């Protein structure tokens, strides 16, 4: 596991694609607990299992509370870099409704509002384009 930073409150590590963000067997918290030799690693934000990237983890209940509050209050910003095929446009904001598919146990785009549906917003900017990518 590539550890970018660690102190007594937080650990910052690179989550590889295919590894869960959550505290499941083989997930990032379990892997970091083993690597750091610490009993407490808590997830405060998530990346989809197929997504790789930098994640911040709390190393105590107090740090988890503070960081989770920052995520909830939108003081925590995630930035993604991606390579796509085709031309999505220069820059846009895409808005969708996200719900949970109980059969496949995954998040899906919902067609209409509902009790378990929440809005999602993605702002993107094309940084470069080459050979259809």
Language-model features: locations:
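RNA pseudouridine synthases
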Residues: 1-131
């Amino acid at each position: 596991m590539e550890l970018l930073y660690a102190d007594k409150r937080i650990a910052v590590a690179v989550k590889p694609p295919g590894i869960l963000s959550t505290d499941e067997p083989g997930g990032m918290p379990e892997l970091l607990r083993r690597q750091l030799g610490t009993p407490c690693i808590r997830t405060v934000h998530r990346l989809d299992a197929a997504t790789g990237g930098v994640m911040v983890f709390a190393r105590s209940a107090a740090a988890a509370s503070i960081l989770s509050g920052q995520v909830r209050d939108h003081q925590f910003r995630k930035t993604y870099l991606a390579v796509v095929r085709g031309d999505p446009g220069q820059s846009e904001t895409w808005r969708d409704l996200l719900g949970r598919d109980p059969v496949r146990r995954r998040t899906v785009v919902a067609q209409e509002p509902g009790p378990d549906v929440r809005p999602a917003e993605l702002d993107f900017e094309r940084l470069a384009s080459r050979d259809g990518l």
